[in-house]
């Protein structure tokens, strides 16, 4: 049986009753506390932003990438951010299901990348499952984004401006 962190990344249902759930919540709270600290950092102090983002992600944020605080995140370890990205202020990432952001990606203000959903069964609503979000190179996003893959598109207000469809 997979541990609870692997289950999240594999899209399996995770229940608060499972062994390891407390450790998951502990990690989430620790990440959110670091994000709170990040919210107090000046946007001009990218060195400190990068230090705190490294702590959140569990790996170094590329030097060529800019993140403007405040930045909200529940769990950063399964999140990867490429080179030359620009992430505007007030973005929210729910990263438990995994987020992959390619190179040269622009993410507008208040964008939400949400990888976690709840069970549709009302009797099991507290259980969650993750679905990965993959954003390929040179994408610009200005929406709330649920699990999917986006490539070479400009997303704004739930529409893809490149192909004029709700979904590519």
Where on the chain are the PLM-derived regions?
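Flexible, glycine/small-residue-enriched loop-and-beta-strand segment within the central core
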Residues: 71-82, 86-152
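Low-complexity basic/metal-binding stretches
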Residues: 144-168
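Short secondary-structure boundary/capping segments
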Residues: 5-6, 57, 125, 131-132, ...
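Short, electropositive, low-hydrophobicity segments enriched in small/polar residues
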Residues: 15, 99, 163-166
């Amino acid at each position: 049986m997979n541990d609870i962190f692997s289950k999240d990344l594999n899209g399996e249902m995770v229940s608060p009753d499972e062994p390891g759930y407390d450790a998951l919540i502990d990690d989430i709270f620790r990440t959110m506390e670091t994000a709170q600290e990040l919210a107090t950092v000046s946007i001009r102090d990218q060195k400190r932003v990068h230090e705190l983002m490294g702590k959140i992600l569990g790996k170094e944020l590329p030097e060529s990438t800019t993140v403007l605080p405040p930045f909200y995140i529940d769990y950063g370890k399964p999140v990867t951010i490429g080179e030359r990205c620009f992430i505007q202020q007030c973005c929210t990432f729910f990263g438990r299901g995994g987020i992959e952001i390619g190179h040269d990606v622009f993410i507008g203000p208040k964008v939400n990348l949400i990888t976690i959903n709840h069970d549709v069964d009302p009797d099991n609503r507290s259980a969650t499952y993750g679905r990965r979000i993959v954003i390929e190179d040179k994408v610009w996003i200005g929406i709330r984004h649920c699990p999917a893959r986006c490539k070479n598109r400009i997303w704004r207000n739930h529409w893809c401006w490149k192909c004029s469809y709700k979904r590519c």
